[in-house]
Amino acid sequence: MAMPTNTFQSLFVNANGVKTRFIVAGQGRPVVLVHGGGPGSSGEYGWWRNIPVLAQHFQVFALDRIGFGLTDTPEDELGDPVLARHLADFVDAVCLKEVYMIGNSMGAYGVARYALDFPDRVKKMVLVASGSIGAAMGLEHKPSDGMRAMRRFDSEPTRENMRAVLEGLVSNKAGITDELIEGRFKLATQPGAMRSQKLQQNYRQRLQNDPNLRQQYSMLHRLPKLTIPTIMIWGKEDRFAPIDELGYPLRDMLPNLRAFHVFEHSGHQVQNDEVEKFNQVVVDFLLAP
């Protein structure tokens, strides 16, 4: 699944004390890609089918978020405030002033949070299948098949359970190669990765029980007022964040969305299912005046 090595550079930068791995490719206006969560997630595995096309038009930055991929793992906490701060520190560390941002799942929450905190620095954003934003807007949904598969991997990290996680993420099972499974499995079981998962679980538990933390997490009163040009993309076959329970209600709560794109044959990682259509929709939106 690897991209041709002549199309990108894999680099590290010190983002306010956090050694952060990122991929950079192309030239032009900067686009920051923010991957979602789950075992073995990284900038490359989240966006490898999209970076080469986006890099034909933009300078693309795909970071490994703190606690993921080859980026450092925090010692004591890994929740949304830490992830949001790390994203802001990364943008500063690579000296970007104004950016386009694209985020998937909990990465889309990070993008929206960055846009709320720094609205003058985000020119446009693309939010892809984000149950995290749905939760921040007060929406609820039943435990999903994808989340159950992820919990099974957390308790029993095997290659078979990694395959089940990936089958929950995408609709096109042909894209789940042995190489992809092995690569994500190695990232998910490296030193520090399991600790990161435990830190995230601890944060989610606190989020359920601490009203003050939930208030900090909430976007209910701020996100609907955001006027940064934004589109949302959702897969009709999403098994992590079902479109009927989260996507359509979220669309109706955000009056300033430029568009809500439904991909009929995509799961949670739309960008890795209907790849050509996704790339075209995103490029057209970002290039439009």
What role is predicted for each listed range?
Residues 18-70:
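Conserved HGGG/HGGXW glycine-rich cap/lid loop of the alpha/beta-hydrolase fold
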Residues 2-19:
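N-terminal cap/lid segment of alpha/beta-hydrolase-fold proteins
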Residues 116, 123-164:
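Flexible "cap/lid" loop of the alpha/beta hydrolase fold
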Residues 103, 107, 111:
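Gly/Ala-rich beta-loop-alpha elbow adjacent to hydrolase catalytic centers
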Residues 157-222:
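Conserved alpha/beta-hydrolase catalytic His-Asp/Glu region
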Residues 52, 62-102, 279-283:
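Active-site loop/oxyanion-hole signature of alpha/beta-hydrolase fold enzymes
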Residues 256-289:
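Catalytic active-site module of serine/aspartate enzymes centered on a nucleophile-bearing elbow/loop
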Residues 220-266:
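Conserved loop-alpha-helix segment in the C-terminal half of the alpha/beta-hydrolase fold
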